[in-house]
C-alpha cells in the first residue's frame, strides 16, 4: 500500500479549497477534500509490517518540534502535465527531519530537491488551469502517516499515525 508523511489543512482551508472553480475537462479528475493533503515525504509502496517503525521514527524526529506556519500559494501550477498543484511553503525543515528519520526504513531512491504541493487535480491538466489563484495560510500542529487505500471507484486516505507538534 502507498504511504506518505503529510499534513492536512484545517477546516477553514478545506472550505476555501471547496470554493475554487472546478470546470469539467476530459481526462481531468478533481481531487476531493479527503485528498487535500500536503505530502512532506511520499514513501511509495510500504509493507504494513514497517508502518509502526516509520511512525516511531517520525515521532522521534519531531519530538520537541513546535507548530509550523505553512503558506499554500500564490497560484496553481501544472506539475509534469499530470497534476495541478499549489506549492506549499514553510515545510522545508519538517521535510528534512522526516526524510532523515525515515531514510533508513524506506530508502530515498530518487533524490530530488524538497518540494511540497497541495494537489487539486490529476490527469490531463490543461495549460489554462495554471495560474488559478489560491493563497492560504495555516499553522500545522500535527503530522500524519497516511495510507492510500484508494481504488478506481473512490479515493480513500486513512491516517495510520498522528504525530502532534507541541514544541
Regions picked out by a protein language model, each given a short descriptive name:
Residues 1-167:
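Histidine-dependent nucleotide/RNA phosphoesterase domain, centered on the 2H-phosphoesterase fold
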Amino acid at each position: 500500500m502507498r504511504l506518505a508523511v503529510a499534513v492536512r489543512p484545517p477546516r477553514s482551508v478545506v472550505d476555501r479549497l471547496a470554493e475554487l472553480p472546478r470546470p469539467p475537462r476530459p481526462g481531468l479528475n478533481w481531487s476531493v477534500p479527503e485528498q487535500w493533503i500536503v505530502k512532506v515525504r511520499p514513501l511509495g509502496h510500504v509493507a504494513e509490517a514497517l508502518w509502526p517503525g516509520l511512525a516511531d521514527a517520525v515521532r522521534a524526529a519531531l519530538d520537541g518540534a513546535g507548530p509550523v506556519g505553512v503558506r499554500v500559494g500564490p497560484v496553481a501550477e501544472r506539475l509534469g502535465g499530470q497534476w495541478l498543484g499549489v506549492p506549499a511553503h514553510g515545510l522545508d525543515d519538517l521535510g528534512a527531519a522526516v526524510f532523515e528519520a525515515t531514510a533508513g526504513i524506506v530508502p530515498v531512491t530518487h533524490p530530488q530537491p524538497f518540494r511540497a504541493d497541495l494537489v487539486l487535480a490529476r490527469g490531463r491538466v490543461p495549460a489554462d488551469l495554471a495560474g488559478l489563484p489560491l493563497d492560504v495560510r495555516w499553522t500545522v500542529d500535527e503530522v500524519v502517516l497516511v495510507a492510500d487505500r484508494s481504488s478506481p471507484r473512490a479515493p480513500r486516505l486513512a491516517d495510520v499515525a498522528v504525530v502532534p507538534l507541541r514544541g
